[in-house]
């Protein structure tokens, strides 16, 4: 067990370092580069009246932005999460924590995840890999993770390709959907199911909604490729070649968003995967997302300083607001109907 615990910590350290220092971008595009807003030269709106507020998980957000799940479990991760939480609280945006599996075996790592005292008002999301339900993690333990950080929802992330390109990855993905349903029924808060960068298909979305999942985070291709991250972690040539061969795998974010929104007009959708700006986020809102998420650029900023992270988030918000004004959109509901060309 101790060896497994140490491996969890080592893997988390590797993931931070690789994401900060290596090119791990998918060779696929998100698809949003094909969408263009029709510029409104006479919007008849005061910039100060542009309203980016929304609600998520029963809480108010100043902008429809999620700091997507990244890290936890290490000293460096603690510092990153504290900065993320501080800035998220000030900006009024949501935040996800990295995978919390290590907390089930090493209770002392709670200090790297527990940020509610820093961010008392924002939606905060606990997180664990869904496949862990096939390896002994119980609904009761999922509730423990939620309670430990006073979370508003639990993310069950689907990372099948990442696991299969990890030498120590989990291989058994059989009969997982019934276990997800059990967690949904057991927990006192909503369950979010999230891909990690390869997209959710229409069929998978239908299955998850039928199981009672309340929010979907489609996390399509176009951003970080976790198989490429694992390629850098490979300890031999074969592992590296296997992982590297999936650099262009997945459903582009735009395609995944369209598929999932076709399944349900009502389910809240978080869209992430390849977003670099508030303009990209605005496009996602226009196509059917409720919230858009970013990770990579926030990670790099948070590893440096709170001030740099704050500037990065303010940049995204200002880009979103300017896009709204230049499309004649006073509110996010207006933006969802803005004129576009494909």
From Swiss-Prot:
The gene is fni. Involved in the biosynthesis of isoprenoids. Catalyzes the 1,3-allylic rearrangement of the homoallylic substrate isopentenyl (IPP) to its allylic isomer, dimethylallyl diphosphate (DMAPP). Substrate binds at residues 11-12, 99-101, 162. Keywords: Cytoplasm, Flavoprotein, FMN, Isomerase, Isoprene biosynthesis, Magnesium, Metal-binding, NADP. Mg(2+) binds at residue 163. It is found in: Cytoplasm. Its main location: cytoplasm. One of its GO terms (biological process) is isoprenoid biosynthetic process. Transmembrane segments: none annotated. This is Isopentenyl-diphosphate delta-isomerase. Belongs to the IPP isomerase type 2 family.
């Amino acid at each position: 067990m101790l060896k497994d615990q140490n491996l969890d910590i080592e893997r988390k350290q590797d993931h931070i370092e690789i994401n900060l220092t290596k090119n791990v971008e998918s060779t696929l595009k998100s698809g949003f580069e094909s969408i263009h807003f029709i510029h409104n030269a006479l919007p008849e709106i005061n910039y100060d009246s542009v309203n980016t507020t929304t609600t998520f998980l029963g809480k108010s957000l100043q902008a429809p932005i999620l700091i997507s799940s990244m890290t936890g479990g290490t000293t460096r991760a603690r510092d990153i999460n504290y900065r993320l939480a501080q800035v998220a609280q000030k900006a009024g945006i949501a935040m996800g924590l990295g995978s919390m599996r290590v907390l089930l075996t090493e209770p002392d790592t709670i200090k790297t995840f527990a940020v509610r005292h820093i961010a008392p008002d924002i939606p905060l999301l606990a997180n664990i890999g869904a496949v862990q339900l096939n390896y002994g993690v119980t609904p009761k333990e999922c509730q423990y993770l939620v309670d430990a950080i006073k979370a508003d929802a639990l993310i069950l992330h689907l990372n099948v390709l990442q696991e299969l390109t990890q030498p120590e990855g989990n291989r058994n993905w059989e009969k997982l959907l019934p276990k997800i349903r059990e967690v949904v029924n057991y927990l006192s808060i909503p369950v979010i199911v999230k891909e990690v960068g390869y997209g959710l298909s229409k069929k998978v979305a239908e299955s998850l909604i039928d199981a009672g999942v309340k929010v979907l985070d489609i996390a399509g291709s176009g951003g970080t490729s976790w198989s490429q991250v694992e390629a850098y972690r490979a300890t031999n040539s074969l592992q590296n070649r296997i992982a590297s061969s999936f650099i262009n795998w997945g459903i582009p974010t735009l395609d995944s968003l369209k598929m999932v929104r076709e399944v349900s007009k009502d389910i809240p959708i978080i869209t992430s995967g390849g977003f670099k700006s508030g303009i990209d986020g605005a496009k996602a809102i226009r196509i059917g997302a409720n919230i858009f998420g970013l990770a990579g650029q926030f990670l790099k900023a948070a590893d440096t300083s709170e001030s740099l992270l704050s500037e990065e988030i303010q940049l995204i918000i200002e880009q979103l607001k300017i896009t709204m004004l230049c499309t004649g959109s006073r509110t996010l509901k207006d933006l969802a109907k803005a004129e576009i060309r494909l």
